[in-house]
Amino acid sequence: MNQPAADMYYSQHMSAGQAPPPQTVTSGAMSYHSQHPPLQPTHMPQYAPQPQYSQYGYANGLTSPQSAQPASQMGQNVLPLPGVATQGFQGFDTTGQVAPPGMKPRVTATLWEDEGSLCFQVEARGICVARREDNHMINGTKLLNVAGMTRGRRDGILKSEKVRHVVKIGPMHLKGVWIPFERALDFANKEKITELLYPLFVHNIGALLYHPTNQTRTNQVMAAAERRKQEQNQMRGAPQTGAPGLPSIQQHHHHMSLPGPQQSLPSHAQMGRPSLDRAHTFPTPPTSASSVMGGNMNASDSGFQWAQGQGMGSAQGANPMSIDTGLSNARSMPATPASTPPGTTIQNMQSYQSGAQQYDNSRPMYNPSAQQSPYQATNPASQDRPVYGQPDPYAKNDMGPPTTRPATSGAPQDQKPANGIIHADQSGGQPAGDEEAEHDHDAEYTHDSGAYDASRASYNYSAPAVGNLPAEHQHLSPEMTGSPSHPPASGRATPRTAAAPQPYYSQQAGYNTPPRVPQQPSSNLYNVMSNDRGTAAGAGTGDVYQPQADMGSMSNGYASQMNGAGGIKRGRDEDDDLQRPSSGGGMDLKRRKTLLDSQVPAMAYAPPVMAQQPRRR
């Protein structure tokens, strides 16, 4: 390993599958400590009578080709019994080299990206003890944990180590105090856990990975590790190369891992890894599988294919895609081969936020200010954020609420519907007409819109009234629908893009809660079904007044009354409620307590006397 001599010696032993005898340790010591080798000849004869250990040759764990020659060279006497070895060498137990009877070497290897080294891992007693490939240091903390040592004693021992490397960040099994190989072997021998940890101390532990029956898998692992190293170096060298950088890396992976012509996706699928890593970006739209990996990963290419995959005109597709590859570089994903390629997944991810494209709501995310430009690599967080629908810092800042609406931009107390009605984004029960009118005003701001602020109307409802919504793919990003350039499909502008209030806001400038469309019967019925007011006293829900939100839809500001049965009690209600006709919340709370006891269908005629009352007060 470190010295060619040691390499030669150990590789022979390893491959022979014989537990290297005590002298292996000495020779190991030779390689590390440069001790004298004379022990080898002296001890060899002692162990001659135990040839049966060659049965345990464990050639399975080691490179088979060499297995024949070392045995012949060294003779059978190289095979010590573990017990004898312990007696022969106090402090230098070679059981680390010898497989205990019946035990198969179980080694896994992972790439420790922070340190740039491959780590071999052996698990014992549920604890994973790691050893680095480059300098063979071993995680002493985990090693002593396997020994069952108390924390205080363990830390004391490790603090007194002269050569140690403390790791405080990273995966759990890699944190701890790393100590040199020889010291770790010492500790393991003292604590009698060397056999338990086999093959952690086998000098040529890498050979155990190259298991003959497992050769292809092992090669894949090692090749992947190599690829990652190279990739990391590339990415560090040119962190934000933009679109051109992607193809090179992408093709680099294809060529390294696969023989034969590298087509866009098929080869990618065979690689096996990208599918995994792509999953941890975000669900890509259904067609992304065939189109995300454009042939050469050119920005326009992949965009073009993606757009066609979505059934959109190529004219729209080719243009906006320039964003994608830049974006994927900009976001802070680990630069593993598979997480880089879905360059378009980022744009797919953004496309999620614009479900009902015709409202153009996600357009300002790209237009308004320099920091939001998706090309900018400095704020990957805010580029990823719209994807997940979290409240977007700039989405809120840039959209001024329409002038007629009270300043609700950040005020959930306004959003909370006056009567506690569950909105369509919560229950989905409201009729379509209601949804549109109501959500165009307040769904962006509703009290539960923490998850929706960034994506706004796109998630909150799918307005059935819009003609081309069914035809268009729900997940298209605003650029792809061309929303910046052509008028919104629905024919109306969003609050953020319109200078003047929308026509349907202007009539109701006086209301503090979002007005409703005149869809009274269904609205009333909805209250009956899902409002928490009606059930307090088994009361009917045909309230004297609709919640303030509903009043906008009625000509005179109150709902039609129920049939005369409730007349007297309702009169009292009005006296209480109407003192503050503008505060919807107060009305509802009182009304909830004092509703009628009879469940009656809504929509009866309103006595004229009642009708005058709101105006008197």
From Swiss-Prot:
GO terms for cellular component: nucleus. InterPro entries: EFG1/Phd1/StuA (IPR029790), HTH_APSES_sf (IPR036887), KilA/APSES_HTH (IPR018004), Tscrpt_reg_HTH_APSES-type (IPR003163). Disruption phenotype: Impairs conidiation and ability of their appressoria to form a penetration peg, leading to unability to infect unwounded Granny Smith apples or onion. Keywords: Conidiation, DNA-binding, Nucleus, Sporulation, Transcription, Transcription regulation. Coiled coil: none annotated. Residues 140-161 bind DNA. Gene3D superfamilies: Transcription regulator HTH, APSES-type DNA-binding domain. Residues 438-447 have a biased composition (Basic and acidic residues). GO terms for biological process: conidium formation; positive regulation of transcription by RNA polymerase II; sporulation resulting in formation of a cellular spore. It is found in: Nucleus. Its main location: nucleus. Residues 106-212 form the HTH APSES-type domain. Residues 45-58, 305-318, 334-345, 488-509, 599-617 have a biased composition (Low complexity). Residues 1-79, 223-274, 300-451, 463-617 are annotated as: Disordered. It comes from the Eukaryota. Disulfide bonds: none annotated. Residues 24-34, 61-76, 346-361, 368-382, 519-533, 553-563 have a biased composition (Polar residues). Residues 569-593 are annotated as: Nuclear localization domain. GO terms for molecular function: DNA-binding transcription factor activity; sequence-specific DNA binding. Belongs to the EFG1/PHD1/stuA family. Transcription factor that regulates asexual reproduction. Binds the StuA-response elements (StRE) with the consensus sequence 5'-(A/T)CGCG(T/A)N(A/C)-3' at the promoters of target genes. Required for the formation of aerial hyphae, efficient conidiation, and the formation of perithecia. Essential for the generation of normal turgor pressure within the appressorium. Required for infection of intact apple fruit and penetration of onion epidermal cells. PANTHER family: PROTEIN SOK2-RELATED (PTHR47792:SF1). This is Cell pattern formation-associated protein STUA. It comes from Colletotrichum gloeosporioides (Anthracnose fungus). The gene is STUA.
